[in-house]
Amino acid sequence: MADVRQPRAAGRSTINSLVLPNPIGRRAIVVGAGSFGTAIAVLLARGGLRTTLQTRTEEQAEQLRESHENARYLPGIKLPQELRIESVESGLSRGEIIFLGLPSRAITETVAELEARGLRRRVPIVAMSKGLVPPDGQLPSRVLAQRFGPLRVACIGGPAHAQEMVNDGAALVVASENENVANLIQQVFLRAGVVCEKTLDPVGVELGGVAKNAAALAAGATEAQGLNAAGAAAGHIFAEVWDYAARLGARPQSLLGLAGIGDLVATALAPHSRNRRAGELLAAGVPPAEIPARVGQAIEAMETVPLLARALSLAGVQAPVTSGLSQLIAGELPLDEWTQLVRTTVPSTSRWRGQTSRAVTARMRDAMRFKGTTSLPPESDS
């Protein structure tokens, strides 16, 4: 790993025209106090950054300051005394590394608001969501790169259930087109005691998270039909996103590693997976608009799958299962027809550097079968 630290007296280093702070003792801001944003803020504080967690309202900030706990999203985790908590109204002028713990749908609007409140363009900005940005289904890192330039943008993926990440660690992946930015973020997490891989493939890492959420939703929607159906649904979704990722120039390792299959298996095994639970509720006939309230948090996959289906179609990718899942969410396809589609679809034979979509489907079917169980386990908040 390249060492991006500079002597404290030097203060800052210039890398590829980007001014990067010495991470240790410098200021990081996490925007968004959901389960994952809160967990990341705790880890950053442990990793030596002077960290601020920003909530949507001052009332929320006051609650967290008084209780030293995010009881709604991360119960049982004591917030470090050194973690500063404030609302987004406080602005970002002090931030030297910015982490966005926001749903993908909120990124464009929120970044515009934050720019007006002092977000500087010459600091690294890290996307942490696992979805697509409306209306065109763009990846979060690409939306940010359009505003700030690709050398200042990074993203995070991998199996990272928030509660477990704080207590027992996780296996994160940080990706950026700028290797030195990836080094910087990796260093902070390693100092916090979290395994963190780095890559120059933000497209692959983000699509791995998108595929994982969509596949978990699909598995939940077919769970009542058996493990084979659930595994097939997840495998088909993953294979279709795989083909799309190939067209965007992503690396196979990104989807086959921690950010893709690793994240999906963690979600499938998790006792509280939001996206899989949403699929179960969808199959039970709960109206899609009511599902987030039933689960208690935003469901990234419910919003992302229609965008994903559209993006795959525009890219010319054959994606019958993703398209069918989008129709199921919209109430345009009955559940029995969705299940039949999953059972009868044969993956395309498109190839990607020696790998076939069918081989990916087989891997996913194996990964999603759970020995000695009769149904997929219950939800992850990553």
Model-flagged regions — what are they?
Residues 34, 38, 58, 85-89, ...:
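Electropositive phosphate-/nucleotide-binding environments in soluble metabolic enzymes
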Residues 79, 84-169, 185:
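Rossmann-like NAD(P)(H) cofactor-binding subdomain of soluble oxidoreductases
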Residues 212, 219-220, 246-260, 264-382:
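NAD(P)-dependent Rossmann-like dehydrogenase/reductase catalytic/cofactor-binding core
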Residues 132-227:
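Rossmann-fold dinucleotide-binding core
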Residues 235-249:
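Alpha-helical phosphate/pyrophosphate-handling elements in metalloenzyme active cores
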Residues 5-77, 86-87, 356:
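NAD(P)+-binding Rossmann beta1-loop-alpha1 motif at the extreme N-terminus of oxidoreductases
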